[in-house]
């Protein structure tokens, strides 16, 4: 009976992040693309500013990387979120499954692991497909900062 209950409980509810397999870890990503938007850092304050400028490898419509398995060959500065460095990424969105599970919170109802597709996530406008612009189209990066400091308003 206990084995049946364990198998009916989703892995993210019965395992810690450290206990998950690599495949389980990867499946937590909802594919929103927020990690794939460029961030700018203030040289004086180290404050992070979020932009709507997509990495060159992000396919904006699908919010998928063009070369995910080889992304570091194309973008050496690409983010690699791991169990070990997760605490360093304080800027992760409040909707990020990695962040939520690390904080002991449940996955959002629109998460692809619960719904079986990304449609609900896109419908909730969690993904960047509605706001992202191509890096090649950007002239002035400051025009694309989403969380502008008060001095830049």
Curated annotation (Swiss-Prot):
InterPro entries: Puta_zinc/iron-chelating_dom, UCP006173. It holds the Pfam family CxxCxxCC. PANTHER family: UPF0260 PROTEIN YCGN. Belongs to the UPF0260 family. This is UPF0260 protein YcgN. The lineage of its organism: Bacteria, Pseudomonadati, Pseudomonadota, Gammaproteobacteria, Enterobacterales. The gene is ycgN.
């Amino acid at each position: 009976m206990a084995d049946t209950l364990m198998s009916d409980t989703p892995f993210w509810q019965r395992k810690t992040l450290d206990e998950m397999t690599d495949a389980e870890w990867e499946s937590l990503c909802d594919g929103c693309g927020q990690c794939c938007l460029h961030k700018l850092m203030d040289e004086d304050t180290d404050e992070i500013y979020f932009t709507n400028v997509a990495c060159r490898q992000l396919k904006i419509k699908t919010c998928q990387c063009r070369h995910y398995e080889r992304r570091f060959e194309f973008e050496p500065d690409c983010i690699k979120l791991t169990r070990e460095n997760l605490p360093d990424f304080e800027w992760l969105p409040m909707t990020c499954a990695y962040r939520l599970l690390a904080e002991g919170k449940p996955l959002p109802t629109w998460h692809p692991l619960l719904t079986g597709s990304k449609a609900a996530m896109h419908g909730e406008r969690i993904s960047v497909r509605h706001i992202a612009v191509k890096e090649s189209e950007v002239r002035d990066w400051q025009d694309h900062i989403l969380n502008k400091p008060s001095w830049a308003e």
